[in-house]
Amino acid sequence: MKDKQAKNNYLSLTGEVVFNKLLIPDEYLGNKRYTLTINLDKDGIKLAEKNGLKTDDYKGKTQITSKRKVEYGMPKVYNADKEEVDATHLSLFGDKVTMLVKQGKQKENSAYTYLERVRVEEKAEGVEEYDYSEF
């Protein structure tokens, strides 16, 4: 397998969306962040382990959550044709994605990742673009 690590500690992690908090950011201790949690696929697990990233095991699946502070702007979202699309293109769960993430710079944060971009490789079956206006 070709090493997917790029310059400046950027990594491409692949898997299936579990929690999508791009349009309605998470708020924790007064800090708002865009977050995306995915179940990593086999290649994603290998890359995360190789780079010492913080993952969680849930019901036999290896998950990773990447974050981005709201003040940095929403991460860009792309479709499978690599065209930039609206964030509503990303389903709340089930889509197969590639996340471009950056490892934390501080030694104590090196296991965490910061979300840069997301590409939807395959839409979840039976799931359409989400209409957030209902909230």
Across the structure, where does each feature detected by a protein language model lie?
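Residue-level recognition of well-ordered beta-strand positions that form the cores
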Residues: T37-N39, L100-K102, R117-R119
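OB-fold/S1-family single-stranded nucleic acid-binding modules
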Residues: K107-V127
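OB-fold ssDNA-binding interfaces and closely related basic DNA-contact patches used
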Residues: M1-K69
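Beta-strand/loop nucleic-acid-binding surfaces
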Residues: Q63-T88
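Short glycine-rich beta-strand segments
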Residues: K67-K69, K102-Q106, E121
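Acidic, gly/ser/pro-rich intrinsically disordered tails
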Residues: M1-L11, K123-F135
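Extracellular structured ligand-interaction cores
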Residues: R33-T35, G94-T98, L115
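Exposed beta-sheet edge/beta-hairpin loop segments within beta-rich domains
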Residues: A80-V97, Q103-Y112
